[in-house]
């Protein structure tokens, strides 16, 4: 699951948690968050004095900002039946990544979401891919909400412009790899109905008695 403004991708993952709780199958679903694979740049943030100053000179909007090879390795380990420890990235503005943080057990279903989930180094790890296409005005609104939460200050405009330009190169072309493309501005009821259909298929294929 990926989109260039992850709110709807996150909504899909929230819905999968509801499904897991409803059918008491949480152990049958493993979640691997792409954003947790950002490299640790905490020392660079400290040297810059703040995350907003750091972000002016470090590009977080390219696949090279993440250790996607490690993500692919972890998914392959899970698929081979191995217990794996996943990293956890602090999104509060410290740029700290805690390695070997989250215990992940092999399961029938592995779900991942994030900006770079369908890029070259990890896309082949997934059997089924969903791209959520977000209108430009909605993406911009969501970005500035997050920018305020992360205290980006006067760096926000530059970061948004850079993110939009890089998305045109690294993210939007990934739509071609998706099995299904969803409209991120679709009616929520229709959107949830679609998710319920996907979940019904998962239930039938993987959890039918």
Where are these regions (language model features)?
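ATP-dependent NMP and nucleoside kinases share a basic, alpha-helical "lid"
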Residues: 96-150
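Single conserved hydrophobic/aromatic residue that forms the stacking wall/gate
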Residues: 1-9, 14
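Conserved catalytic segments around the Walker B and adjacent sensor/switch elements
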Residues: 25-33
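Conserved nucleotide-sensing/catalytic segment adjacent to the nucleotide-binding pocket
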Residues: 30, 39-91
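NTP-dependent small-molecule kinase module
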Residues: 18, 105-106, 124, 144-148, ...
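Receiver (REC) domain switch/active-site residues of two-component response regulators
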Residues: 35, 127, 179
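Anionic, Ser/Thr-rich low-complexity intrinsically disordered regions
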Residues: 137, 154-162
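A conserved segment at the C-terminal end of the G1
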Residues: 15-26
